[in-house]
């Protein structure tokens, strides 16, 4: 086993990487309120795990979506628990994100030289809201359907480009199968990928610049 480790160590310098990760200086003013960002990340990972589990049973069609969610809740082993955890962690993620934003703002963590860290955080906040909008529609019940109809209809008030934007969001002039397919693709592939990319950027900048000092 040691020979295998030595082989990787010689090429990747694993010990140096481990030492750098475990020996990072943490300022003495850091307290429990600085944990909100980490809790948000934890909620996202829970979302990924539980969401991935549900993709095995969910069917993104207007005729089968609601029935597949019902099947998850009533027939799949621990399906009710997995979906409930997905919903609870979604709410927790939004709440922790809001608290994290307030903490960063109140402690001046957005100021020079951390402007780009703040920008990536704002982008992540927008993506998080988009998760909520797209995920809300997936059961395709009455609440989800009308929520999608209202949200996708908002851009219609924009002069000139409003109508094309609505059609782009819905996939057609009205809410239907194309809309559900787009929202499902956004919720399960596009948004998670964007979140992973911007989270990586966010953490690398925090790692490089360190935690902001007290006011």
Swiss-Prot record:
Molecular function terms in GO for this entry? electron transporter, transferring electrons within cytochrome b6/f complex of photosystem II activity; metal ion binding; oxidoreductase activity
Q: Can you list the GO cellular component terms from the UniProt entry?
A: chloroplast thylakoid membrane
Essential cofactor(s): heme b; heme c
Q: Which residues bind heme b 1?
A: 100, 202
- Any note on cofactor binding? Binds 2 heme b groups non-covalently with two histidine residues as axial ligands. Binds one heme group covalently by a single cysteine link with no axial amino acid ligand. This heme was named heme ci.
State whether it acts alone or in a complex, and with which partners, per the record: The 4 large subunits of the cytochrome b6-f complex are cytochrome b6, subunit IV (17 kDa polypeptide, PetD), cytochrome f and the Rieske protein, while the 4 small subunits are PetG, PetL, PetM and PetN. The complex functions as a dimer.
Q: What is this protein called?
A: Cytochrome b6
């Amino acid at each position: 086993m040691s020979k295998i480790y030595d082989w990787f160590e010689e090429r990747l310098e694993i010990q140096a990487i481990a030492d750098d990760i475990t020996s990072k200086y943490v300022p003495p003013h850091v307290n429990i309120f600085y944990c909100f960002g980490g809790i948000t990340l934890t909620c996202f990972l829970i979302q990924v795990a539980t969401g991935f589990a549900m993709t095995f049973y969910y069917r993104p069609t207007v005729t089968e979506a609601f029935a597949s969610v019902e099947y998850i809740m009533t027939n799949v082993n621990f399906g009710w628990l997995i979906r409930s955890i997905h919903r609870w962690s979604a709410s927790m993620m939004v709440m922790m994100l809001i608290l994290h934003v307030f903490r960063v703002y109140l402690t001046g963590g957005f100021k020079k030289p951390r402007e780009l860290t703040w920008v990536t955080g704002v982008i992540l906040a927008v993506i998080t809201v988009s998760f909520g909008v797209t995920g809300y529609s997936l059961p395709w019940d009455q609440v989800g359907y009308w929520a999608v109809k209202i949200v996708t209809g908002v851009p219609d008030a924009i002069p000139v480009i409003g109508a094309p934007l609505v059609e782009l969001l819905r996939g057609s002039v009205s809410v239907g199968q194309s809309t559900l397919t787009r929202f499902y693709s956004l919720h399960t592939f596009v948004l998670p990928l964007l979140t992973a990319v911007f989270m990586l950027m966010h953490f690398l900048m925090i790692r490089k610049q360190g935690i902001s000092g007290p006011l």
